[in-house]
Amino acid sequence: METLDKIKKQISENPILIYMKGSPKLPSCGFPARASEALMHCKVPFGYVDILQHPDIRAELPTYANWPTFPQLWVEGELIGGCDIILEMYQAGELQTLLAEVAAKHA
């Protein structure tokens, strides 16, 4: 499967998906740690892809997403943004609302 097809499949199969370095429980550095912590505090199921284990996705996704950095949060096929946006939305209460609605819809 081509890398771009793999990315599209992951995004379509996971209503809430974060591309990050490491895993939510073992992030590789501060940005994915803060982003995944915010997601875990929302108490909804989400998927993740460790881009360190998938160098092809790490190379291709920034072009596909038109977003150069990681982590990247995707919700229902749309890029929400990276760490700063995730944290801003969380602090404003917007992330919790969005993710709860999406999780309920896909339960």
Swiss-Prot record:
Q: Report one GO cellular component.
A: cytoplasm
Per UniProt, glutathione binds at K21, R58, F70, C83, D84
- Quote one Gene Ontology molecular function term: 2 iron, 2 sulfur cluster binding
**Keywords in UniProt for this one?**
2Fe-2S, Cytoplasm, Iron, Iron-sulfur, Metal-binding, Redox-active center
Q: Which CDD domains match?
A: GRX_PICOT_like
Q: Where is the Glutaredoxin domain?
A: 4-106
- Residues that bind [2Fe-2S] cluster, according to the entry? C29
Identify the main location.
cytoplasm
Cell compartments where the protein resides: Cytoplasm
Among the Pfam families in the record, one is Glutaredoxin
Q: Which InterPro entries does this entry report, sorted A to Z?
A: Glutaredoxin, GRX_PICOT-like, Monothiol_GRX, Monothiol_GRX-rel, Thioredoxin-like_sf
Task: List the NCBIfam families.
Answer: Grx4 family monothiol glutaredoxin
Q: Which PANTHER family match?
A: GLUTAREDOXIN FAMILY MEMBER, MONOTHIOL GLUTAREDOXIN-S14, CHLOROPLASTIC
State the function annotated in the UniProt record.
Monothiol glutaredoxin involved in the biogenesis of iron-sulfur clusters.
Which family is this sequence assigned to?
Answer: Belongs to the glutaredoxin family. Monothiol subfamily.
> What is annotated about its quaternary structure and interactions?
Homodimer.
What is the name listed in the Swiss-Prot or TrEMBL entry for this protein?
Glutaredoxin 4
The species is: Haemophilus influenzae (strain ATCC 51907 / DSM 11121 / KW20 / Rd)
Tell me the lineage of the source organism. Bacteria, Pseudomonadati, Pseudomonadota, Gammaproteobacteria, Pasteurellales
* Underlying gene: grxD
